[in-house]
C-alpha cells in the first residue's frame, strides 16, 4: 500500500475525501488543503485518472527537521534518489514555505536540487538534468515551520489541466473547482443543465464529462511519473484502457442535453472548441446570447438546473452593471424557469442577494485568493409574472419624484437635477440626473452601521434605480463620498476623461461624471447662475473660486461686457475654457486666470460691476498663502471685494457652511449691507435640503 496525499482548493476537502473513497481509497484523513489516504498501485493511477477535484496527487517520500540549510540538504539526501529515477530522467523542484533559516524559496529549491544531484555524483552515476518546463519527475518540498515535507508529485502539471482548454474568457475558474461547483449544484445527470454566462464552457464541459463517465485525465498528455523507477506501465495502460471504454459507452448512452450562452461570440467559439476537444461537443448547444435574451429551452419540461459563475467586479464602477445583471437574472429565473433549480457561484454574497431568491443550501470555497460562496435555489412552479422589487418603499418614492421632477425639468429647460435626496433616512443617498446618465452618491456610513448591511442596501438602491428609471446600467455612476474637508472636495478619482454635454436653461455645459468626486456642475446653484445671467447685461463680471466656470457662461450669455474667471486649478480653468467655448464665448472679453484667489484679491486693482464668489468652507491648500475659514474670514474677504466693486455694483456671495452667520455689523463697518436670498436660489429638487447652501446679495449700504 502507498501513503498518498491529494491536494485541493480550500473548502473542497470533504468533497474530495468522498470522491477518493468512491475510488477505493482507505484511511482517508482530511487536513487543510487536501486529504491523506492509502491505496495500492492501481488506486494511485485511478486517483490520477479519475479525480475531478484533486489539484495534485503526491507520494510522500520523507520529512526532516530544518534548523539550517545544511539540515535541509542532508535531510533531502537521505532519500534514495538513485532508486527513484529512471536513467536519463529530468527533474524539477517546487519549494514552498519559509522559516527563520530558509527565507527564500528559490534558495530552498537550489539546496534540494544540489542534494539530489549530489546523491548521483557520489555514486559515480550520471547527474540528472533539471527541466523546469516539462520534467519527467517533479519533487515537491513544503517547509512548515521547522519541518520539510518531501514528496514526489505524480501529477506533473496540476490535475485541473485536463487538456481540453486552449484559452479562457475573463476571470476563469479552474476545472477542478468547476467540477466541485457542478457536484454541489444539486444537478442530477440525465436532466438538462443550462449556463447563461458560460464563458469558455468549463462548468458545462465538466458536467458533461461527469455525466458521460469520461475520466478527467483521459486527454492529458503529460504526467509526473514518466521518469519514476517504480512506475508500473502495465497497470497504467489498464487504467487508461478502462477509462477509454467507459467514456465511449457513457457518451453513447447519454440522452439529455446541455445549454450554454454568452454575450461574447469569440468566447462561445472557444467554448465549442473546448467541448469538442473534451469529446462531448455533440451534447452541448452553445449560443451567443445576452442574459436579457435568455429563455427556457424546454418550456414544456423536463425540469433541469441553471448553473452559473457570473462576473463579480472589484472596482466600484463595475457594480451598477453587475447589480443590474443579477437582478435581471433573478427576474428571468422566476418568470421562465419555475420548477427548475438554480446554483450560483460568486465572490460577492451581496450580489447574490440581488437575485431576490431564498437559498436552500450554500457552500463555501476558495477561487484562488477569493473567498466564494455557492448558493442553491429551487424555483417554485408558481413563481411567474412580475416579481416584487428590491427596496419597494425606496422605489415608490423614486417613482413619485420622477413623475414630479421630470415634467418640471422639461418645462424649465434643464437636463441636470436631483431626483432623490435622502428622502427616506434608511436609504441615505443622493441621486442626480445628467441627461440620460444618473449619479448615485452614497455618504460613507458611520462606523456604527454594519458594513455588510450598508453595502447590501446600496445594492438594493442601485437595482431599484435602474429598474424605475428603465435605464442602461452602464449609464449609472456610483460614488461613495465622505463628508468633505477642504481640498478633499475636489479629489481625483480616475483618469477616464469622459465628458458629456448637458443643457441648463440656455447654456450648454460639459460635465464629467467619473473622474472627480464632483461632476463639474453644482446643481444646487442652478438658480443663482440664472440670476447672475439676468443681472449681467452690459456689466464686467468677476467669478472667483470659479470651479468649471458655469457661472461665467451664464453671465456671458446674459450679455456681460466681460467675464473674468479665477481659480487656482489649471484643470478646472481648462474645463471652464471648454464651457465658454461651447457657448461661443471666446476672445479677450472672456479671461481665465490661474491664481490663489485670496492672494489675487489682495493685489488686484481692477473694477467690476458684478462679482460672484463661492469660496470653500475651509481650505488649507499648500498653494494658498493662508488657511481659510469662511465663517472666520468672510469680513476680511468682503474688505478686499469692496475695493474691486464699482459704485452701484453687487456681490453675490454663497457658501456651503451649515449654520453660517453673516456678520452684519462687520459689513456695516465697511459700508456694505447683505440681503439673504438662500430660499430664492433653492429650486424644487433641493427643497428637502434647505441648508445645502446659503446665498447673499451684498451692496453698498
UniProtKB/Swiss-Prot annotation:
Record carries keyword Methyltransferase: yes
Cross-referenced InterPro entries, in alphabetical order? 23SrRNA_methyltr_KL (IPR017244), DNA_methylase_N6_adenine_CS (IPR002052), RlmKL-like_Mtase (IPR000241), RlmKL-like_Mtase_CS (IPR053943), RlmL_1st (IPR054170), SAM-dep_methyl-trfase (IPR019614), SAM-dependent_MTases_sf (IPR029063), THUMP_dom (IPR004114)
Keyword Cytoplasm applies: yes
MF terms (GO), sorted A to Z? 23S rRNA (guanine(2445)-N(2))-methyltransferase activity; RNA binding; rRNA (guanine-N7-)-methyltransferase activity
Keyword terms: Cytoplasm, Methyltransferase, RNA-binding, rRNA processing, S-adenosyl-L-methionine, Transferase
Q: What is its EC number?
A: 2.1.1.173, 2.1.1.264
This enzyme catalyses: guanosine(2445) in 23S rRNA + S-adenosyl-L-methionine = N(2)-methylguanosine(2445) in 23S rRNA + S-adenosyl-L-homocysteine + H(+); guanosine(2069) in 23S rRNA + S-adenosyl-L-methionine = N(2)-methylguanosine(2069) in 23S rRNA + S-adenosyl-L-homocysteine + H(+)
Which spans of this chain does the record mark as coiled coil? none
GO annotations of cellular component type: cytoplasm
Q: Which residues form the signal peptide?
A: none
Domain named THUMP: which ranges?
43-154
The entry's localization annotation reads:
Cytoplasm
Q: What does this protein do?
A: Specifically methylates the guanine in position 2445 (m2G2445) and the guanine in position 2069 (m7G2069) of 23S rRNA.
**What is the similarity comment for this entry?**
Belongs to the methyltransferase superfamily. RlmKL family.
- NCBIfam families per UniProt: PRK11783.1
This one is known as Ribosomal RNA large subunit methyltransferase K/L
Q: Which organism is it from?
A: Klebsiella pneumoniae subsp. pneumoniae (strain ATCC 700721 / MGH 78578)
Which gene codes for it? rlmL
